[in-house]
């Protein structure tokens, strides 16, 4: 009574196919597959970008820390907003 038989699962599958249709289910499956493939490719690229023997450059005691500027970094400053009126 507690477990579902194969017939229960087949009936559920038929109802899902009638509600969503086979085309919609196919689109969902292909979207899910391409998302998983994109995730795996991204993880693979991330591992290739980071060589195994690379380490962070260490600073010497007499030098101030260097600032790294990237073309995509935007330097901003926060201001307090006070109520006027």
From Swiss-Prot:
Q: Which domain of life is it from?
A: Bacteria
Record flagged with keyword Disulfide bond: no
Q: Does the keyword 4Fe-4S apply?
A: no
The annotated regions of Basic and acidic residues compositional bias extend over: 39-51, 66-85
Name the residues that span the membrane.
1-21
Mention one GO biological process in which this protein takes part, according to its record: protein transport by the Tat complex
Region annotation Disordered: where it falls in the sequence: 39-85
Q: Which residues form the signal peptide?
A: none
Alphabetically sorted, this entry's keywords are: Cell inner membrane, Cell membrane, Membrane, Protein transport, Translocation, Transmembrane, Transmembrane helix, Transport
- Renumbered to this chain, the Polar residues biased-composition regions fall at 53-62
Which cell locations does it reside in? Cell inner membrane
Q: Cite the InterPro entries for this sequence.
A: TatA/B/E, TatA/E
Listed under GO cellular component are:
TAT protein transport complex
The protein's topology relative to the membrane is: Single-pass membrane protein
Q: Name one GO molecular function term.
A: protein transmembrane transporter activity
Which proteins does it associate with, and in what oligomeric form?
The Tat system comprises two distinct complexes: a TatABC complex, containing multiple copies of TatA, TatB and TatC subunits, and a separate TatA complex, containing only TatA subunits. Substrates initially bind to the TatABC complex, which probably triggers association of the separate TatA complex to form the active translocon.
Q: Which family does it belong to?
A: Belongs to the TatA/E family.
Alphabetized NCBIfam families for the sequence: PRK02958.1 (NF002813), tatAE (TIGR01411)
Functional description taken from the UniProt entry = Part of the twin-arginine translocation (Tat) system that transports large folded proteins containing a characteristic twin-arginine motif in their signal peptide across membranes. TatA could form the protein-conducting channel of the Tat system.
This chain belongs to the protein called Sec-independent protein translocase protein TatA
Organism of origin: Ralstonia pickettii (strain 12J)
Whichever gene encodes this chain, its name is: tatA
């Amino acid at each position: 009574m507690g477990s579902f038989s194969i017939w229960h699962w087949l009936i559920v599958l038929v109802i899902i196919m009638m509600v969503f249709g086979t085309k919609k289910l196919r689109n969902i499956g292909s979207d899910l597959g391409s998302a998983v493939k994109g995730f795996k490719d991204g993880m693979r690229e991330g591992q290739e970008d980071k060589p195994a023997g690379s380490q962070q450059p260490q600073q010497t005691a007499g030098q101030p820390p260097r600032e790294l500027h990237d073309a995509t970094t935007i330097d901003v400053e926060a201001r307090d907003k006070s109520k006027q009126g």
